[in-house]
């Protein structure tokens, strides 16, 4: 992988020291508080799943502990997040495997390897969609599904972008220097078009309203798309 500053080095570090439990619930919404759960992924019994941008591994750990998949591959490009996840939930191997790689890098060459791919404000948010979505479709088995949650609008209220362009958002390097990173906050119709152009069919969308009126509350856009059976 390229040697670049790990902009996720600090994210979730404090929580990892005080909360090591496998979550009892799976949430898609921005606040991780309400709305639909793992049922959106379908029947997971005996299925092979991949999480794109798995962070500390909490969603993947929940699925392994409560939904009996054959395997979950939890993929993250951040060295710190990968190490944190493995330290928290590595004991759930061999059904849970943490992979240190970028999402596009991991999916290339894995044609028809997965029944389900998902992302909870993960790699789909932080990877050029025109690079990620086609390889995600190819990595799914016929009839397989991709489900991801993303911001329905920018945190702070600015509308989502009307075309496939990224927004620069604040970030920090491991030594604390202030930099920026790219996040794709796209309008619903833009995501639908990007998915269809990447080979997906049956695209479904749902907007999950923000929980409460907190300063950083934001609506969630939940998208489900399928690789064609034929």
For the regions a protein language model found, what residue spans apply to each?
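A short acidic, Gly/Pro-enriched loop at the edge of an enzyme's catalytic core
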Residues: 108-117
């Amino acid at each position: 992988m390229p040697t670049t500053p790990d902009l996720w080095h600090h994210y979730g570090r404090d929580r990892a020291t005080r909360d090591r439990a496998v979550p009892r619930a799976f949430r898609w919404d921005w606040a991780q508080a309400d709305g639909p759960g793992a049922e959106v992924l379908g029947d997971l019994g005996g299925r092979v799943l991949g999480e794109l941008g798995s962070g500390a591994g909490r969603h993947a750990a929940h699925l392994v502990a409560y939904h009996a998949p054959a395997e979950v591959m939890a993929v993250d490009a951040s060295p710190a997040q990968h190490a944190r996840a493995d330290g928290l939930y590595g004991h759930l191997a061999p059904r849970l495997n943490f992979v240190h790689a970028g999402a596009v890098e991991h999916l290339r060459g894995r044609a028809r390897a997965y029944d389900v791919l998902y992302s909870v404000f993960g790699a789909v948010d932080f990877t050029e969609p025109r690079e990620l979505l086609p390889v995600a479709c190819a990595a799914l088995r016929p009839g397989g599904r991709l489900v991801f949650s993303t911001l329905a609008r920018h945190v702070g209220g600015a509308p989502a972008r009307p075309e496939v362009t990224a927004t620069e958002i604040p970030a920090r390097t491991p030594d604390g220097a202030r930099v920026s990173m790219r996040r794709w906050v796209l309008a619903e119709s833009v995501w639908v078009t990007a998915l269809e152009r990447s080979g997906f069919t049956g695209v479904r969308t749902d907007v999950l309203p923000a929980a409460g009126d907190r300063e950083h509350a934001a609506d969630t856009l939940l998208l489900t798309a399928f690789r064609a059976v034929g």
